[in-house]
């Protein structure tokens, strides 16, 4: 699988990332099968978080034989120093490793999140201390609002961002365009979430897939256009949704390595007009 450079870090990552939620609630045997499949396909970027149920517990043993050859990203959604330190210790234990390559503030959304993270006893001080100790290599964040992401970048020199760069949000709301521009100017590593999300669920609508809180693409053809769009942006990699069908589609599309055509781009722009984007949230 093709690899791209993760901004100024110089790390070479596969253009498809393995979303740890894939192994959430799976058996040890199934988790091992999924990780082995990813490795066979050339994936070296794995992303997980404590709030993905038991994903860390299932990913750790399955990934252990390959740990020295992969780039492991983890997160903490806690905003205080002590909480992050506790989260990190538990993540190391569950993931069967002695270090995390990329540790990220998870789902930063509100001004309050940012204020708590940046406070004297906030999460960011813990992240810096962990990096100084050598148990994490890079510091990043994922965000669900552009405002929160831009505020974080105003206050700290992060290595990476993880953000929903998606065809519907991009074309309907210009969501992420300011952030993308700033990240490029600073040569940050740019990672994408939700490339295969199609629309927000309607009120009372049941999930089509248990591990997806949004409605994903319907067909392989739609997935192909959507993922090719995200990969046409100056990103390093796109993390897959939590269901194997979409993981398989993403790998096939990446292996095919076809550029987005003008006709496909126009189709995506037109399709986006009729859809309710997943971000910004109401």
Please describe what each predicted stretch is.
Residues 16-29, 73-83, 115-116, 210-218:
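Active-site mouth loops of central-metabolism enzymes
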Residues 1-70:
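N-terminal binding-site loop/beta-alpha segment at the start of enzyme catalytic domains
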Residues 25-38, 81-96, 144-153, 221-227:
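Short, acidic/polar
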Residues 7-10, 40, 59-68, 89-98, ...:
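Acidic (Asp/Glu)-rich catalytic clusters
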Residues 92-115:
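Active-site groove signature of glycoside hydrolases
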Residues 69-80, 102-106:
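A short, structured active-site edge motif that brings together acidic residues
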Residues 108-282:
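Beta/alpha (TIM)-barrel catalytic core signal, keyed to glycine-rich beta->alpha loops juxtaposed to Asp/Glu
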Residues 6, 18, 46, 59, ...:
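Conserved, mostly hydrophobic/aromatic
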């Amino acid at each position: 699988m093709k690899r791209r450079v993760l901004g100024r870090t110089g790390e070479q990552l596969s253009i498809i990332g393995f979303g740890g939620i894939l192994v959430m609630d799976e058996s040890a045997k199934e988790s091992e099968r999924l990780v082995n499949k990813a490795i066979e396909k050339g994936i070296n970027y794995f992303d997980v978080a404590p709030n993905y149920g038991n994903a860390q517990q299932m990913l750790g043993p399955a990934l252990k034989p390959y740990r020295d050859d992969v780039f492991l990203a983890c997160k903490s959604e806690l905003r205080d120093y002590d909480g992050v330190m506790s989260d990190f210790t538990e993540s190391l234990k569950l993931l069967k490793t002695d270090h995390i390559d990329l540790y990220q503030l998870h789902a930063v959304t509100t001004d309050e999140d940012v204020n708590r993270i940046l406070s004297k006893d906030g999460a960011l001080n813990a992240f810096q201390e962990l990096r100084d100790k050598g148990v994490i290599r890079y510091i990043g964040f994922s965000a669900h609002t552009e405002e929160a992401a831009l505020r974080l970048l105003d206050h700290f020199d992060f290595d990476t961002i993880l953000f929903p760069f998606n065809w519907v949000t991009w074309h309907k709301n210009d969501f992420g365009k300011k952030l993308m521009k700033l990240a490029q100017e600073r040569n940050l590593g740019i990672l994408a979430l939700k490339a295969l999300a199609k629309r927000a669920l309607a009120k009372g609508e049941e999930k089509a897939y248990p591990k997806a809180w949004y409605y994903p693409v319907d067909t392989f053809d739609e997935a192909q256009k959507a993922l090719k769009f995200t990969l046409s942006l100056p990103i390093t990699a796109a993390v897959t949704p939590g269901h194997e069908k979409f993981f398989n589609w993403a790998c096939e599309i990446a292996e095919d390595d076809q550029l987005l055509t003008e006709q496909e781009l126009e189709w995506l722009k037109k399709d986006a007009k009729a859809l309710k984007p997943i971000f910004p949230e109401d």
